[in-house]
Structure formats: structure tokens, C-alpha cells
């Protein structure tokens, strides 16, 4: 079993436990994370669980989390970047949350091109793990239940786009973005729930576009390069889709810091191209 196999097994085991205990953290506040956002108790709890599961694997050199200010040195090997509980504010209303993990063959900060694997856990009506690895030709999906993992199949983005989920209030987004957003929303079904993993799962299943643009409140975008944008871009591009920060693939974004943010768009290539073209005219 190589290091990527051990990471995959550890994530499956930890996700089983997280899935069964989320209700215990539905209404627990916990302060602010290093990005200045409100934490819930589940954020810190999940981060501790995944740290214990991943940081001590032979071949892991560093662990970076959305919930920690600094990278933790673990020895030599791959660098882990994780959002342990994406969409955690959804817990209070009993809506879907997730876990996002990027595995980098480089010291952090690093561009997404340095990744060798991306893992996405969705805690919904049932729990799934979607994984892309450099040593596999397909994006695999696994069903996690009753302490076991069952391979369900593989993802290839549908050729026809049917859904769209674009974040941000109309009054906080640029006119150019609102124009292209309205065009997409006239033709596609709206799917936006406030947890990036859950919203992207809609795009992977049905085809379409997910995005978090520049807004007045988040002038650099809201999602973080290491913990959300690049790992999900790796997954989407491996499944035949495309990613963008508005002008280039998210895998080409070069972050200066661990918690750097970027505008984020993920989905069918023709929609991403159309979005980039519209934004380039401003």
C-alpha cells in the first residue's frame, strides 16, 4: 500500500465517523478561523480528527488546514491541504456539508499543478467519497456506509449542462458578472445551497457551472486556493470539465500564502469559456 492508498483509507475511515456524529455539533459556536470567518464546533472537531488520521502517515510531510493559521510540519513527503468541514454553517439547518482535501507533491504554498490527488467527501442523505489521483485514469466515487466502502462508479462530466449555482448577492457583484449570470440562469436550473461540496456534486452529476466571483465583500473571491479551489479544480478537470479564476485554470493560480483566496468557477468547459469571454470584455 503506497502513501496515496493510505491517505484514501484514512479519509474513508474518518469520514465514516464524522458522518455518524455531525448532529452533536449542529449548534456549537467556536470563534473565528484564520480567515476571519465564524467557526462552529464541528470545524475544530473535524480538523482534529483528520489531523490525527493523516499527519502521522509515513510519507506525509505537512498538514495545512483552513482551521489552522500555519502549516504543521510532519516530516518528509506529500503536503495535505484540507477544509475539514466545508459548509459547516449548514449544520444548524440540517443541510449537506463536506470535506475537501488536496494532496500536493510540494511544499506549501504551491500551485494546483503540484497536486497528485484530490478527495471530496459529501455528507448528505448518504455519504460519498469522490477521488481523483494521478495514478488513476478515472475519477472514482465510493459509497461510505456501515463502516465499509463500496465503489459506486466513476465520474465524467455530462456533455449537456443543466444546472448552475453562482454565489454572491446581485448588488455586491460586478455588472459584467451579473449579466453573464442572468444569461446562465435563464437557461439552466438553479442549484445553490451554500456548501461548495454539495453544489459541486450537482455539477458533477448533472453538468453545469458552479462559481464564487469577486464581490464587494470578498474582492479576491471567497474560496481559498489550497483548501477549496485548487483541489476541486483538480477533480473537475480530471472528470473532463474545466476550472477558472476568471482568466486561467485554477490549477495555474500561484498563491503567496496558505490562506490566499481566489475567484472560483468549476464546470463544463463551454460554460467556463463563455464566462471568461464575458469577463474579459470589462
From Swiss-Prot:
Predominant localisation class: cytoplasm
Binding site for Mg(2+) 2: 83, 86, 228
UniProt keyword list: Carbohydrate metabolism, Cytoplasm, Hydrolase, Magnesium, Metal-binding
Any Pfam family hit: FBPase_C
Superkingdom of origin organism: Archaea
Residues where Mg(2+) 1 binds: 66, 83, 85
Pathway connected to this protein: Carbohydrate biosynthesis; gluconeogenesis
UniProt name for this protein: Fructose-1,6-bisphosphatase class 1 2
Organism in which the protein naturally occurs: Haloarcula marismortui (strain ATCC 43049 / DSM 3752 / JCM 8966 / VKM B-1809) (Halobacterium marismortui)
Lineage: Archaea, Methanobacteriati, Methanobacteriota, Stenosarchaea group, Halobacteria
